[in-house]
Each structure stands twice: as C-alpha cells, then as structure tokens.
Amino acid sequence: MFSEEVLKNVFPLLEGEDLASCMGVCKQWRDIARDDFYWKCQCAKKWPSVCKRHKPPTETYYKMYQTFSKRRLNRALPPPRLSFENLEFFIDIWSEERLVFSGLIPGVALENGIETLPLGISNVLRTHLGRPDYKMVVPAEPRFTIPLNQSVSVSVLVARNDSDKVARIINRSVFDYIDRSSYRALAFEYLDLSPCYPFISGIRAWISLLFMDVEDMNDDGLLDVFGIQLDFNDVADTKEEVLWLLDMLDWK
C-alpha cells in the first residue's frame, strides 16, 4: 500500500474524476482524498475566480465540485402536485359550425386509454398506439364521422376538482393536417402558461383524431373517428412530466 506522503503528493495532480475514484479504493485513500485542499485544487482548475475568496462559496470545495462539475442531464422530478383523479377534460369538436362531438372526459379515462382497440384499424395506427411514449387516449363515445372536405376544429379545457379552477389547452384549433399513412388528423395549440413561468414559451399541445382504416380515402369521403389522443410530446414523455406541465397552465 502506498504511504500517506506519496498519496498526498499525487492526489493534487489528479483530475477530479480520478480523485473521486481514489476515494473508493480503501478507507485510507478515502480519508486522505476528503481533504478539502485537493478539491480546492480541482475547483481552481475549473473556476479560478472562486479561490479569490477566503472560504468556498458552498459548504466545502468538495461539495461545489460534486455539484457543478458536470451538467446533470437526467434530473428526477419531484412528485407532481396534480393527479388525474382531480382533473376533468372538456373536449368539443366542430365540423364547420356543426358540433360533432362534445365530451366531459374524466382524467383517469384519458390516463387509462383504450383498453381494447376496435377491429378494422390499420397496423400503422395500432403500432403507434403501442409505443412506449406517454400519450393520453380516450375512445370517441359516441363514434362520429367528419367530412374530408370540411374544416374541423377543436377546443379543449381542463378543470381541477381540488380548486374549482379551469385552464385552456386548445382554443378552436383546426385539424389542418391529415396523416393518411397513420390514419390521424392532427391539430395543435401553443399552451398558455402561468405568469409564474415568464421565460418558458413555445410548448405545444397536440390533439389527434384516430380514424378507422378505409380502402379509398378521397377528398369527398368521411373519416370514421374511434378515438381521440392528447399529448405534449414536444417536451413531456412521462406521466409525471405531463402532470407537471398541466400544473404550469394559466389556471383561472
């Protein structure tokens, strides 16, 4: 085993990652490497100005190095303050000015999705719905049809049962894109977030109409809609992220 004097001469020459690895070798190495002098040397390499103080900006130089030396890419979210049990979604869909669907959807229904997919949907759409990315899907009950040659728009509001507040997600957005290969009609809206988040913008809510497979999809035909999908896949890929995003809405 190396003598203590040898280690004390070598440790200041190491890079931070190597010094941290040395702490796991044995108790002797760990006790020596925990000396804050070595971590002051590491901080001096990365941020020379912090050593102009008489003491570290944080409790120790070791804590400062461990906290700020690497960019944390995957930070765990705290538990969301909202739950789907306390949410209700109001979805209204118009074909031109004719109301074709109006649904009060409990949050848990959107969370649970469509348990049994109907027969007659395309394999592409079936694969899309089976992907692991988080999406909220609900059956269209009752089923409805929309003409391809008419403008179809949608509004979505969400209410909180725990505070009697409502927020807007989508405001009469038009389904101006029909993905005929995946049997979806898509619309989006940029979210209105609370003024508490002034530096966040450009987050979209996407809503899709899921329709049955048809042999001949011409411009004069009808789309048989069996489901509605809502997601925020630009930024939110998990249930927790979706709930935090909903919590950030401009609740009134």
Curated annotation (Swiss-Prot):
Pfam families xrefs: F-box-like
Domain of life from the UniProt record: Eukaryota
Signal sequence coordinates: none
SMART domains: FBOX
Xref: InterPro entries: At5g39250-like (IPR044207), F-box-like_dom_sf (IPR036047), F-box_dom (IPR001810)
Residues of the F-box domain: 1-42
Name of the protein this chain belongs to: F-box protein At5g39250
